Amino acid sequence: GNRLARRFETEVNQFAGISMRDRPMSEFDALVCDLWHGCGMGHLTLDWSYGASGFLAVKLDHSPMEDIGPKGHTADDLFTGVLEGFFGYFSEPGLLCVQTGDRRLGDKEGTTFILAFAEVIKKVESLRAEKISHGVIVARLGSD
């Protein structure tokens, strides 16, 4: 994820002549989502509205991993590391990612993740251990 982010930043900066870090968030979001889809990694949706609460909610549709592995296996767990490395490159050190839902396991909200720092991730992991859905986790974190 980190190497992908570095290459992405270098190539976009060279092409556009404007640093990725100086772009409005809406442009950054559009470029990242286009990159994700263009690399065949599915359709990424980022909910930036929870940034002030210390986390980002992420949804991945049409993941290439959805049909791989035995039934009951968390198919997109490898994307946890890719997301963590990619977004960690653009953030403060210590950004972590937890998968909070998987379409293959029947999660109605689809394949979902939370990006946050350690304090929030501890809460996410605790809620996930209780089998709490992504939407409820997001609502609880957003109200803290």
Go through each PLM region and give its residues.
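N-terminal accessory segment detector
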Residues: 1-78, 96-144
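Active-site helix/loop of acyl-thioester processing domains in fatty-acid/polyketide metabolism
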Residues: 77-94
